[in-house]
A protein has these predicted regions:
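Acidic/polar-rich alpha-helix caps and helix-coil junctions
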Residues: 1-4, 8, 19-185
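Basic, alpha-helical nucleic-acid-contacting "clamp/cap" segments
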Residues: 16
Length: 185
């Protein structure tokens, strides 16, 4: 399934995903050339056919973007099967992405947390600017991977759109903490 809109990541998202030493050192990672540039900080809008355009503004939208593709299926499978059984699926995926991939034995030698971090790092690179990082961190309860919440724990939740609260009718449907007065506009 593929639904696409013209969107750009927020400044915070873009700055946290710009090419770093880890990304630059990955030999054969074709996504580096396709997604990042070391010359400037233009935002990238990706399209299903592999083309892209630079965003005209850093404004971002709340329009949902749902993408499902084979690379995501490999990573979901590797994560679901766990380190013992998922190593082969992860190696298969990585061989399609890199000229060199870690061996199955090397992946199995990782601790469970290191294995999960490896998959989360792959998902971060694979789904750059697609809005999946936050859900991955929340789903795996790995908030330490965020730079900082600066004590703003309400950022762990999304605001509930006012339309949804209104549709609840007589049922009390409180807004999530930290979003008092949020209307969704």
């Amino acid at each position: 399934m593929l639904f696409r809109s013209n969107y750009a990541p927020s400044d915070w998202c873009y700055n946290s995903l710009f090419a770093d030493d880890n990304t630059l050192s990955r030999k054969g990672d074709v996504r580096l050339k396709a997604t990042f540039t070391s010359q400037d900080a233009n935002r990238v809008i990706k399209y299903p056919n592999g083309t892209y355009q630079l965003a005209e503004t850093s404004d971002y939208t709340c329009t949902p973007v749902v993408i499902s593709r084979i690379s995501e299926m490999y990573l979901i499978k590797a994560e679901a099967l766990g380190k013992t059984n998922g190593a082969a699926a992860l190696v298969e995926y990585m061989k399609k992405r890199y000229t060199t991939a870690p061996s199955e034995a090397a992946i199995k030698a990782l601790s469970d947390k290191e294995y999960q971090t490896l998959i989360l790092d792959e998902r971060r690179r694979e789904f750059y600017a697609e809005g999946m990082r936050w859900q991955d961190i929340k789903r795996t309860n790995r908030l330490e991977l965020l730079e900082t919440l600066d004590g703003r724990t309400y950022l762990m939740y999304y605001p509930i759109p006012q339309d949804e609260i209104d549709m609840a009718g007589t049922v009390a449907y409180p807004q999530n903490p930290g979003y008092a007065g949020y209307t969704g506009n």
